[in-house]
């Protein structure tokens, strides 16, 4: 079984594009935190991980319309590793979460004052 469940905050606004056939694809970066206890001073320690998520079709359209940086999000899907050659000819790899569904959690983040 290949199943991933994440809850975190969007680290950036989604990047949504359409393929030549008209299918929407959204790339999202989700930040999750793991609690690591407290340091000697009693301050909370945590580790932040950044995950690459990819959504297709209606999910991608929804992401483009309603998601923005800072939004708390539940996402589930499956892991997929892609590879490519960079400009120096090195083979690169990236593991992504292909999103099956997501839910908005909490209120919309406040706009920053200008």
Spans of features found by a protein language model:
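Single-stranded nucleic acid-binding surfaces, predominantly the OB-fold ssDNA-binding core
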Residues: 1-114
């Amino acid at each position: 079984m290949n199943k991933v469940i994440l809850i975190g905050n969007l680290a950036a606004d989604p990047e949504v594009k359409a393929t030549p056939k008209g299918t929407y694809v959204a790339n999202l970066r989700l930040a999750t935190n793991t609690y690591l206890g407290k340091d000697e001073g009693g301050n909370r320690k945590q580790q932040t991980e950044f995950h690459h998520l990819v959504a297709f079709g209606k999910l991608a359209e929804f992401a483009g319309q309603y998601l923005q940086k800072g939004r708390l999000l539940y996402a589930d899907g499956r892991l997929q590793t892609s590879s490519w050659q960079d400009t120096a000819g090195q083979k690169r790899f990236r593991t992504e979460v292909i999103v099956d569904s997501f839910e908005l959690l909490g209120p919309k983040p406040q706009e920053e004052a200008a």
